[in-house]
Amino acid sequence: MTNIRKKHPLLKILNEAFVDLPAPSNISSWWNFGSLLGICLMIQILTGLFLAMHYTSDTSTAFSSVTHICRDVNYGWLIRYMHANGASMFFICLFLHVGRGMYYGSYLFMETWNIGIVLLFAMMATAFMGYVLPWGQMSFWGATVITNLLSAIPYIGTTLVEWIWGGFSVDKATLTRFFAFHFILPFIVTALVVVHLLFLHETGSNNPTGINSDADKIPFHPYYTIKDFLGVLILLTVLMILVLFFPDILGDPDNYTPANPLNTPAHIKPEWYFLFAYAILRSIPNKLGGVLALILSILILAALPLVHTSKQRALTFRPFTQALFWILVANLLILTWIGGQPVEHPFIMIGQAASISYFTIIVILMPMAGVIEDSLLKFTH
């Protein structure tokens, strides 16, 4: 008798995705982040669901309802901080996952990669709207500043902003719709994740050598289920250390002050995981130019397959491009730092230099390095 997991219509799909899936025998811990992102998504949906049971999306009660969750609801403080810090862990895993894809040339799986970019945008939209919900000072002013950027769109900009606000400023209507969108988007993300996996399983996973691994495959279970479980254990340990010992370390103190439209905070800034993009936005003195640069800072990932010049897929055996990759990582850390600094000398200049080098490395230097490496290795184009 054949095992039920291979016969049952539903179990068969799960079996082919998580049990009998042929996986390369040499994928490293950098391939753990996909499953970690899945765990993060599950944590966020569950904690978010329980928060939504006690949260009210009205401007007069939103801040109080979050306070009520932390003080009066059983383990409400735990759920709230798991959700807030879970978002940070989500983005850490996300950045490492994308970085892995860039390093090992996984972007050559075009469909999987492009769905991943759509996922990244959806995640950023979800996180931004979630940050508005507690209705603290940074929630309100962050929402005002970021939504206002749409007014830079020629002709329809102002109308579009007022349409999103549901009025002439960020107010009750804005908060209510942001709550609605914040609730629905994670489920859209989940659907996109399924499509992401569907396309990945069409080709199979890439591996650290960047070479076809069809000749040497092993079953996903038990090898990678146990390996992923270790990753999950580390993720949960780090998350719980954050939640139980340093719950506010990644937040902004301004968000413990209720939203006040008459009082602007000294430095309006988003959550840490958006600071690199915020720095790129601020480095351009023109409003529309800044918005375009902001979008391009993520959308440029879609250009990676187009500017891949090397005959080799991964950076494993390509020292020049490797060096450029790590310079790019350092550059992103500099942008993150600059995004949290006030707009004054010398931060303006550093931000502009880092923004220019960010795009230059990806679009010009890395493709050039690929061509140089090929010629040095006598790979004829």
From Swiss-Prot:
Q: Where are the transmembrane segments?
A: 33-53, 77-98, 113-133, 178-198, 226-246, 288-308, 320-340, 347-367
Q: How is the cofactor bound?
A: Binds 2 heme b groups non-covalently.
Its biological purpose is as follows: Component of the ubiquinol-cytochrome c reductase complex (complex III or cytochrome b-c1 complex) that is part of the mitochondrial respiratory chain. The b-c1 complex mediates electron transfer from ubiquinol to cytochrome c. Contributes to the generation of a proton gradient across the mitochondrial membrane that is then used for ATP synthesis.
A molecular function (GO) held by this record is: ubiquinol-cytochrome-c reductase activity
Cited Pfam families? Cytochrom_B_C, Cytochrome_B
Q: Which keywords appear in this protein's UniProt record, sorted alphabetically? A: Electron transport, Heme, Iron, Membrane, Metal-binding, Mitochondrion, Mitochondrion inner membrane, Respiratory chain, Transmembrane, Transmembrane helix, Transport, Ubiquinone
Listed under GO cellular component are: mitochondrial inner membrane; respiratory chain complex III
Residues at which heme b b562 binds: H83, H182
Leader sequence range is none
- Topological relation to the membrane, as annotated: Multi-pass membrane protein
- For binding heme b b566, which residues are annotated in this chain's numbering? H97, H196
Q: Does the keyword NAD apply?
A: no
- Kindly state the subunit structure of this protein: The cytochrome bc1 complex contains 11 subunits: 3 respiratory subunits (MT-CYB, CYC1 and UQCRFS1), 2 core proteins (UQCRC1 and UQCRC2) and 6 low-molecular weight proteins (UQCRH/QCR6, UQCRB/QCR7, UQCRQ/QCR8, UQCR10/QCR9, UQCR11/QCR10 and a cleavage product of UQCRFS1). This cytochrome bc1 complex then forms a dimer.
List where in the cell it is found.
Mitochondrion inner membrane
Which pairs of Cys residues are joined through disulfide bonds in the record?
Answer: none
Query: Can you supply a Gene Ontology BP term from the record?
Result: mitochondrial electron transport, ubiquinol to cytochrome c
Q: Please, what other remarks does the record include? A: Heme 1 (or BL or b562) is low-potential and absorbs at about 562 nm, and heme 2 (or BH or b566) is high-potential and absorbs at about 566 nm.
Q: Respond yes or no to whether keyword DNA-binding is given for this record.
A: no
Q: State the family named in the UniProt similarity comment for this chain.
A: Belongs to the cytochrome b family.
Q: Which domain of life is it from?
A: Eukaryota
PANTHER family named in the record: CYTOCHROME B (PTHR19271:SF16)
Q: What is this protein called?
A: Cytochrome b
Q: Which CDD domains match?
A: cytochrome_b_C (cd00290), Cytochrome_b_N (cd00284)
